[in-house]
């Protein structure tokens, strides 16, 4: 299954992202609003430069199966930016392109995977001092539907991607992780 293949082959990228965002501080309750601003801003840049490209690559074949309209996160993270008084800016020096729908699915794997962790982050930070006024639009995007949305995504991915396309899917995931890790 391609979802397992991606999990195994992107683990080092996932770990690097956790390190970049000081994720260990979330559970020790030492994560600050400044740390949160960094994670939101970086994820905003990732979504700004990828979401439309991913969706346009997938729209015809996967639009309904993946419920793409319900998966749009850019408007949600823009609300978080506004509530944190952060600027909407671009990362023009970083180009992000996906060659085909398989790469787009790989990139989407990174974004959808972040919603699983994001849900945990939102719950944890809502109990952390200093986060009383923070809205979690992006990290809480699916709320109680996080599990079912992830399950749907994985099922479509595992059903629709043939083994000969695993490398292309992995390539898309690595492209997006590389962008995320280097955009700031």
Summary of predicted features, one role per range:
Residues 1-184:
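Metal- and O2-centered redox machinery and metal/ROS homeostasis
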């Amino acid at each position: 299954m391609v979802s397992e293949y991606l999990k195994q082959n992107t683990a080092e990228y996932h770990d690097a992202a956790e390190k970049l965002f000081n994720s260990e501080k979330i559970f020790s309750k030492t994560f600050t609003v400044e740390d949160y601003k960094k994670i939101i801003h970086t994820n905003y840049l990732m979504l700004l430069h990828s979401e439309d490209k991913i969706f346009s690559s997938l729209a015809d074949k996967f639009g309904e199966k993946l419920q793409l309209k319900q998966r749009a996160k850019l408007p949600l993270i823009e609300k978080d930016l506004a509530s944190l008084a952060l600027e909407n800016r671009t990362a023009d020096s970083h180009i992000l392109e996906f060659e085909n729908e398989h790469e787009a699915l790989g990139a989407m794997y990174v974004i959808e995977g972040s919603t699983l962790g994001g849900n945990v982050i939102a719950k944890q930070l809502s109990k952390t001092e200093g986060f009383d006024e923070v809205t979690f639009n992006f990290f809480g995007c699916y709320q109680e539907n996080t599990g079912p949305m992830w399950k749907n995504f994985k099922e479509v991915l595992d059903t629709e991607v043939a083994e000969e396309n695993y490398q292309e899917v992995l390539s898309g995931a690595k492209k997006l992780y590389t962008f995320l890790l280097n955009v700031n």
